[in-house]
């Protein structure tokens, strides 16, 4: 089995997406199987617009995948499922990922990537 390690930017996006309790609940719910937006919103107890915002963030981070399916009455329904990922973190993985960061550190400002 080939181990693929995320780049620093991918790792930051994934961890930032999972740092939100609601997004963590969304991933946990979808781990049980694919679900469509309206049902998922009712299941989790949030509005569809709020759910859409969080689903987009998770999709951009590569943690979930969305696809359209037609219902029996011909209505398009957006389903989401968990993407195939297996994330293992330790100091070595973090150090390797940090070497590949392309985005500046917001805490250090735009000068973070500049060399003297």
Give the role of each language-model region.
Residues 10-50, 69, 76-81:
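N-terminal helix-turn-helix DNA-binding core of bacterial DNA-binding proteins
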Residues 42, 59-60:
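Alpha-helical residues within the helix-turn-helix
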Residues 54:
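Residues within the DNA-recognition helix of helix-turn-helix
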């Amino acid at each position: 089995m080939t181990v693929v390690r995320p780049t620093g930017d991918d790792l930051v996006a994934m961890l930032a997406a999972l740092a939100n309790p609601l997004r963590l609940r969304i991933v946990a719910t979808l781990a049980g199987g694919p679900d469509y937006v309206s049902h998922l919103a009712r299941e989790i107890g949030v509005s569809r617009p709020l759910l859409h915002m969080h689903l987009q963030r998770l999709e951009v981070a590569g943690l979930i995948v969305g696809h359209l399916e037609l219902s029996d009455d011909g209505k398009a329904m957006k389903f989401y499922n968990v993407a195939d990922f297996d994330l293992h973190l330790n100091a070595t993985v973090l150090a390797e990922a940090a070497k590949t960061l392309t985005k500046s550190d917001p805490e250090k400002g735009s000068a973070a990537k500049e060399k003297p």
